Amino acid sequence: MAIKTPKEIVKILNEYIIGQDEAKKSVAIALYNRYRRMQLSKQMQHEITPKNLLMAGPTGVGKTEIARRLASIVEAPFVKVEATKFTEVGYVGRDVESMVRDLVGEAVRMEEKDQFARVKPQATKEANKQLVRLLAPGVKREKRENQMQQMQDMMSMLMGGANPNNQNNDQEEVTDEVRNERMDVAEKLNKGLLEDREVTIEVEQAPKANPMSDMMGQMGMDMGSMLNDIMPKKKVKRTLSVRDAREVLIQEESRKMVDYDTIYQRAIERSQNNGIIFIDEIDKIIAGNKRNSGEVSREGVQRDVLPIVEGSTVNTKYGPVSTDHILFIAAGAFAESKPSDLIPELQGRFPIRVELNALTKDDFVKILKDPQNSLLKQYIALMKADGIKLIFTQEAVDKIAQIAFDVNQGTDNIGARRLSTILEKLLEDVLYEGPDMEMGEITITEAYVEEKLHDIIMNKDLTKFIL
């Protein structure tokens, strides 16, 4: 993937996020500095650490979206965690190291996807060969087992493996007739003529969730994976269309072709050098003026987070992971506190401070119309599925934006999220009646917005509950 300059990164962010230019500029610089670091000598690379960011601003102004889009631009492993989910060591709750384990898990998923894409052509060939054999099976002949084989089958059952009686204990004989039939099936398969035909395949049974595995995972161990590697794989039969069966078989063949040790190693490197951890609601772990046991625990969480942010090694089931060069982005509303209320050591680990501004009416107008995935474009696409062309006049858009701004000012300010609740209420009848409407076009005007939302806006109690 081509390296993008800070200006190019900001330009991409502008396609999805309105305003907040200072925040976009700061994260773009932090991201590009990673590329600069990789061009230096190994010794200098080790010395240069990421400049972590602390974003302060009301809810719904784009803090999370900036970080999420940033990660997608460079295809970096990204996890979002909430600071309130963590507890001090010794208390019930998630330990802070779990954020690093989650990051590595995401990196493994990304690396596995990349490797699967690399081997997909060969895996597809093997999957098609299996489909041909299933659609044109050979002549079955009973396989004679010697006494030693019977003993091995019995031991397999005792160890938890599949019952030999349920397995395919027949030998397949491929006659000339079967061979010709398979050639015919292969030709039809390549032309896509058998996609809807059903076929029965054997697939590995997914391991059941085990609470003990989760507990072991928090200690960097995965007993479930260890046992799955030792114990025989159980298989179940599933009847699927050829189209769906091919995808399942491609996945199974891909797993056989890739080297998971390499995947895990690359995932760890990817996490260490490119990983982004977004810590939301960091203001909620600031202790208040009145100290009690709960407040002490909040400060304890800060002290537990500190070594992760400043650089340490965390044991995961894929191997030890260094957090020295992971980029941390913390965010919070700081409505009842300020960043300087964090413990001094943690403040020092977030040297770049960015304040995000509350959204104005003009911002709401742009949010409704400009982004690639804007809310109006989403509703227009939904109605298009019913064969209806949905049109919003500029006056209607201005009115919706004004209502969102006024409701935020009069009640709790939830930023751009207010637009979703307003639009859902505004278009409730249209969405309900849509499939039965015969008209090909619906225009949302300012008068329609007034009619649908006027009574709710005038009644403050209804506004709080509905909008």
UniProtKB/Swiss-Prot annotation:
The keyword Transcription does not apply. Belongs to the ClpX chaperone family. HslU subfamily. It comes from the Bacteria. Keywords: ATP-binding, Chaperone, Cytoplasm, Nucleotide-binding. It is found in: Cytoplasm. ATPase subunit of a proteasome-like degradation complex; this subunit has chaperone activity. The binding of ATP and its subsequent hydrolysis by HslU are essential for unfolding of protein substrates subsequently hydrolyzed by HslV. HslU recognizes the N-terminal part of its protein substrates and unfolds these before they are guided to HslV for hydrolysis. The gene is hslU. GO terms for cellular component: HslUV protease complex. GO terms for biological process: protein unfolding; proteolysis involved in protein catabolic process. A double ring-shaped homohexamer of HslV is capped on each side by a ring-shaped HslU homohexamer. The assembly of the HslU/HslV complex is dependent on binding of ATP. One of its GO terms (molecular function) is ATP hydrolysis activity. It comes from Lactobacillus helveticus (strain DPC 4571). Pfam families: AAA, AAA_2, ClpB_D2-small. This is ATP-dependent protease ATPase subunit HslU. SMART domains: AAA, ClpB_D2-small. The keyword Membrane does not apply. ATP binds at residues 18, 60-65, 280, 345, 417.
